[in-house]
Curated annotation (Swiss-Prot):
Ranges of residues in domain SIS: 31-214
Alphabetized SUPFAM superfamilies for the sequence: SIS domain
InterPro entries reported in the protein's UniProt record: RpiR-like_SIS, SIS_dom, SIS_dom_sf, SIS_GmhA/DiaA_subfam, UPF0309
Gene Ontology process terms (BP): carbohydrate derivative metabolic process
Top-rank taxon, per record: Bacteria
Stored HAMAP family: UPF0309 (MF_01240)
GO molecular function, one term: carbohydrate derivative binding
Protein name in the entry: UPF0309 protein LMOf2365_2617
Similarity annotation: Belongs to the UPF0309 family.
A matching Pfam family: SIS_2
Length: 247
């Protein structure tokens, strides 16, 4: 099974390279432009998609201007099944997005593989209303196979200024066994992480080419990194309180 899973995942990544690279580069350019103008990069996902927002937050080799919107009832640790129920509620996003410090010039990255549930769609639209540029990471194939649960009939892909397709199959899982009817082994976390890291790599290279110093963290386990990292925390802590919370 390991060979099958890795083979399929590699093919998905190759498809992303072949078909989505221009969108990734465009997204990277917008991220660079935002950071060069004191913007913040917000990310949101429900359920397992929220994992990707934490993958790029306070990350060694990653950008400091990253703000994951972590609404705990929509994560997993306060009730996994309950989070799925909430994700399907129209207008629920208004209960937490109203207080988010999203400004014109910021970037909002919204992740949902199915792209059918109301909360990610509403998050994208509220962020746009606040002036953010919206980047969506979703599966166009999966999304097209399912009816939208949003009252407008929209899917997440309808809300993005840039839409990047992670290529996930319907249901996300890619493996099957002859003696088992349910597909297993999802791919969207792997492809999502690659897409995000590629966007930010493009952004960092763009900033370097613009003679702008990218705000990149050094691993805290490398000697003499602490002062560098603390300066970045201090720089962004007002906009991203999660960076310095509880210190």
């Amino acid at each position: 099974m390991i060979n099958n899973y890795i083979d399929i995942t590699v093919r998905l990544l190759e498809n992303i390279l072949d078909n989505e690279a221009d969108y990734v580069k465009e997204a990277g350019a917008k991220v660079a432009e935002s950071i060069e103008n004191d913007g913040v990069i917000h990310l949101f996902g429900c359920g397992h998609s929220h994992i990707l927002t934490e993958e790029v937050f306070y990350r060694a080799g990653g950008l400091a201007a990253i703000h994951p919107i972590l609404h705990e009832p929509l994560m997993l640790h306060e009730g996994a099944a309950a989070s799925s129920v909430l994700e399907r509620k129209n207008d629920y996003a208004k209960t937490f997005m109203a207080e988010e410090d999203i400004r014109p010039g910021d970037i909002m990255i919204v992740l949902s593989t199915s792209g059918r549930n109301p909360v990610p769609i509403d998050v994208a639209e509220i962020a746009r209303e606040k002036g953010a540029f919206v980047i969506v990471i979703t599966s166009l194939q999966y999304s097209a196979s399912q009816k939208s649960r949003h009252t407008s009939g929209k899917r997440l892909s309808d809300t993005g200024d840039i839409v990047i397709d992670n290529g996930a199959v319907k249901g996300d899982a890619v493996l099957k066994s002859a003696n088992f009817d349910i597909a297993f082994a999802p791919t969207s976390t792997v492809t999502g992480a690659v897409i995000l890291q590629s966007i930010f790599a493009e952004a960092i290279e763009t900033m370097v080419n613009d003679n702008f110093t990218p705000p990149v963290f050094i691993s805290g386990n490398v000697e003499n990194a602490d002062a560098h990292n603390q300066a970045l925390v201090d720089k962004y802590n007002e906009r991203i309180p999660l960076l310095g919370m509880n210190l």
